[in-house]
Amino acid sequence: MAPKVFRQYWDIPDGTDCHRKAYSTTSIASVAGLTAAAYRVTLNPPGTFLEGVAKVGQYTFTAAAVGAVFGLTTCISAHVREKPDDPLNYFLGGCAGGLTLGARTHNYGIGAAACVYFGIAASLVKMGRLEGWEVFAKPKV
């Protein structure tokens, strides 16, 4: 399932169909947030059922918001700048997602650090896609 969702994102050219790109990044981030929430609730059990539901929602919706902001920012910056395959678009998207995380946590330090780290990570992923880097090589049979 994961390769299908990632393929859905990468098959859309940058700077086009921003709503579909935002949907893809939101769904990917939501699954990541739900996974983090499952670990959080399992390893640090809440006092009541409602506290657990609140924590799961908090993690999931925060991740979904970060994913949506990332997808929209990368697509809109590619469209506005008219440079669809530029890693700077992904840096801007990662930075915007990091700032969203900082706003959610009400912490400037987290927002600034997440802006830099998410931006660098996203631009490295884009550079890797453009240059054909293989992180996990396919086995040669």
Swiss-Prot record:
Source organism superkingdom: Eukaryota
Transmembrane segments: 21-43, 58-80
Gene Ontology cellular-component annotations: mitochondrial inner membrane; mitochondrion; respiratory chain complex I
Topology of this chain in the membrane: Multi-pass membrane protein
Single Gene Ontology BP annotation: proton motive force-driven mitochondrial ATP synthesis
Residue positions, PTM N-acetylalanine: A2
Location(s) in or outside the cell: Mitochondrion inner membrane
Assigned keywords, A-Z: Acetylation, Electron transport, Membrane, Mitochondrion, Mitochondrion inner membrane, Primary mitochondrial disease, Respiratory chain, Transmembrane, Transmembrane helix, Transport
Major site of localization recorded for this protein: mitochondrion
Family in the record: Belongs to the complex I NDUFA11 subunit family.
Described purpose of this protein according to its UniProt entry: Accessory subunit of the mitochondrial membrane respiratory chain NADH dehydrogenase (Complex I), that is believed not to be involved in catalysis. Complex I functions in the transfer of electrons from NADH to the respiratory chain. The immediate electron acceptor for the enzyme is believed to be ubiquinone.
Disease implicated: Mitochondrial complex I deficiency, nuclear type 14: A form of mitochondrial complex I deficiency, the most common biochemical signature of mitochondrial disorders, a group of highly heterogeneous conditions characterized by defective oxidative phosphorylation, which collectively affects 1 in 5-10000 live births. Clinical disorders have variable severity, ranging from lethal neonatal disease to adult-onset neurodegenerative disorders.
Subunit organization: Complex I is composed of 45 different subunits.
Protein name per the record: NADH dehydrogenase [ubiquinone] 1 alpha subcomplex subunit 11
Native source organism of the sequence: Homo sapiens
